[in-house]
Amino acid sequence: MITFPHRHLLGIKGLTEQDITLLLDRADEAVKISRQREKKTSSLRGLTQINLFFEASTRTQSSFELAGKRLGADVMNMSVGNSSVKKGETLIDTAMTLNAMHPDVLVVRHSSAGAAALLAQKVSCSVVNAGDGQHEHPTQALLDALTIRRAKGKLSRIIVAICGDVLHSRVARSNILLLNQMGARVRVVAPATLLPAGIEQMGAEVYRSMAEGLKDADVVMMLRLQRERMAGSFVPSVREYFHYYGLDAETLKAAKDDALVMHPGPMNRGVEIASEVADGPQSVIEQQVEMGVAVRMAVMETLLLSQDQGPRP
């Protein structure tokens, strides 16, 4: 029997160390399932999962779809491009229409911060936030944590340097919250134009130099330069950005010899990370993709099979 005190996964904020550990432990078991020849289980047989993606994301949507199917759920992907949303239907109208179909879980990605939380107030099923604007991306932080824990054996008392476009990154926010909760030391390395106000209050140490920020780091997490979210000139040029804040083999030498190199994807090779590092021996980027399916399996199973969620609205 699973005991988990939440009906939804809207963010890392609000999760305890025990909540996170439970999800990671279950994800460890899901890794074993994914590596078997027979990968499908029946734990969610008869339950329905709807993936509602208002932002394109091939890897995240595919990961959620595969996670649901491996657990035996019926999975529906809603293509927003072909939906009533394009005809003027609001987010709430769409959600209420889907809710009338009695799904068991809605997986939502939206460009507006707080969209998943808003839906959770309106529907009678569980809601999983697959990324909401610049707010949070909880399953990405969980899969990053699982990747680190499996490689390092722990999350506490390690140094994690998160580098690049922190300002526009929901991945950075969720990771800072999770890693602090689990006892890690978190650094952010970025130019002033790509740092959000109040980042120190979230529990991150701020560095403006890669050499200083990466010193003795156990994990180096690079972030994509999100030019599609930029309304102004945040960096002088891509070439200059890579010179000062890109990760290549020489820059990586500042970190520990066994430091992990991570990236949430998709990567901009030659913008924030060099191919020699992305494809090098310290890279765990492919492992992150594998852990993503396992974490999403764990989240679905935990939310839908928990005996301690409280009454539905």
Swiss-Prot record:
PROSITE patterns to which the protein is assigned, alphabetical: CARBAMOYLTRANSFERASE
Pathway membership, UniProt: Pyrimidine metabolism; UMP biosynthesis via de novo pathway; (S)-dihydroorotate from bicarbonate: step 2/3
Positions bound to L-aspartate: 87, 170, 224
Keyword Ribonucleoprotein: no
Catalysed conversion reaction: carbamoyl phosphate + L-aspartate = N-carbamoyl-L-aspartate + phosphate + H(+)
InterPro entries with a match to the protein in the record: Asp/Orn_carbamoyltranf_P-bd (IPR006132), Asp/Orn_carbamoylTrfase (IPR006130), Asp/Orn_carbamoylTrfase_sf (IPR036901), Asp_carbamoyltransf (IPR002082), Asp_carbamoyltransf_Asp/Orn-bd (IPR006131)
Gene Ontology terms: biological process: 'de novo' pyrimidine nucleobase biosynthetic process; 'de novo' UMP biosynthetic process; amino acid metabolic process
Keywords: Pyrimidine biosynthesis, Transferase
Pfam assignment, any one: OTCace_N
Gene Ontology CC terms, in alphabetical order: cytosol
SUPFAM superfamilies: Aspartate/ornithine carbamoyltransferase
EC number: 2.1.3.2
Binding site for carbamoyl phosphate: 59-60, 109, 137, 140, 265-266
An example molecular function term from Gene Ontology annotations: aspartate carbamoyltransferase activity
Binding partners and assembly: Heterododecamer (2C3:3R2) of six catalytic PyrB chains organized as two trimers (C3), and six regulatory PyrI chains organized as three dimers (R2).
Family in the record: Belongs to the aspartate/ornithine carbamoyltransferase superfamily. ATCase family.
UniProt-listed NCBIfam families: asp_carb_tr, PRK00856.1
Protein role: Catalyzes the condensation of carbamoyl phosphate and aspartate to form carbamoyl aspartate and inorganic phosphate, the committed step in the de novo pyrimidine nucleotide biosynthesis pathway.
PANTHER family: ASPARTATE CARBAMOYLTRANSFERASE, ORNITHINE CARBAMOYLTRANSFERASE, MITOCHONDRIAL
Protein name: Aspartate carbamoyltransferase catalytic subunit
